[in-house]
Amino acid sequence: WSPVMMRYLERVAEVTPPFRVAVEVRNRSWMEGEARDSFLSLLRSANMAYVAVDEPELAWTVGRDFPVTASWGAVARFHGRNREAWSKKGVTVAEKFRYNYSDDELGSWEAPARAAAGEAERVFLMFNNCFRDYAVKNALRMKCLLGIACSPGEGVQGEIPFDE
């Protein structure tokens, strides 16, 4: 967080209508104390969505708070919780996002997603744990956990063979 970045977001809010904008931050400083209040207030006043992030809990990461700031939608992105890879420098994208969520981890988002659905027109849960087929399988599993058109066998935790 910085005053310069807040001014930048204010400018984004001025020039982007009628487009819908979602803002994802990657440093805890945005969601602490007065910075959090002013940041979320700006998003609400501009009808821009805060992007909640599921990522490893590290000293600098944002945390799993899911405030709804836009009437048109609530957004969460799932990057995986590969703490070891996120803590290292120079890791590949594949290493960083090599994370397959458990049902318990996905289930921890059920109540926040349902609460967001009561405040926003739509809820977007996007999976960016893009190693092999993990994002697709986890998205299908989340769909089933939320009871959204789940077919038998959909979201089953299995391996799809890939060439290395």
Model-derived regions, located:
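Residues lining hydrophobic/aromatic ligand-binding pockets adjacent to catalytic sites
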Residues: 1-164
